């Protein structure tokens, strides 16, 4: 298998952004897997060549990356990640040519770091995460698996973010706080103190608006 061959899973808007990142990182994109009704169509310059049921036939030909977005719920991204793993496939870890990831930081498999993002020394980012455009993951911060840190967000030093968390665009996490699992933080929020109850938070300071059942 050529380690630079890549199959994208999910053909929406996030897929277009990941295509640009993958091209900048030197990947050879073989095609996109999407819904049955999309087969034969194109996403930018790349054909939709099948559905996620076709993952097993590409395991020996390419790595995979999940290109379904995550705003309200990570369930589809988690399902795709697990489907690749169950098929014996490998998930690529992709860093845009314009991003900076410290050699003292770690990234989990299936994670993509988008253009102009920074992951600083000592930071740990889990599996199947989106570190979106212009994000800053500061020193010694920990991001759990299956998270989306959205555009322009600042995760300050020593923060800990649990699994399956979405942090909306241009939000700020104050130094050293903890965000629990299965939490959504609305765009433009300032999380000044640690939060743990599952639900939707927003505002400055960020407060719980909707508690998950």
Question: What residue ranges belong to the model's regions?
Answer:
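Short helix-capping segments at alpha-helix termini
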Residues: 26, 85-89, 193
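Short alpha-helical
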Residues: 13-14, 72-75, 106, 190
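Phosphate-bearing ligand-interacting subdomains
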Residues: 40-96, 100
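Cofactor-binding loop segments of dinucleotide-utilizing enzymes, especially the Rossmann-like FAD-
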Residues: 11, 34-35, 69, 96, ...
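Short amphipathic alpha-helical segments
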Residues: 19-21, 77-80, 125, 196-197, ...
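Hydrophobic, well-ordered beta-alpha structural blocks that scaffold small-molecule cofactor pockets
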Residues: 1-43, 49-52, 56-57
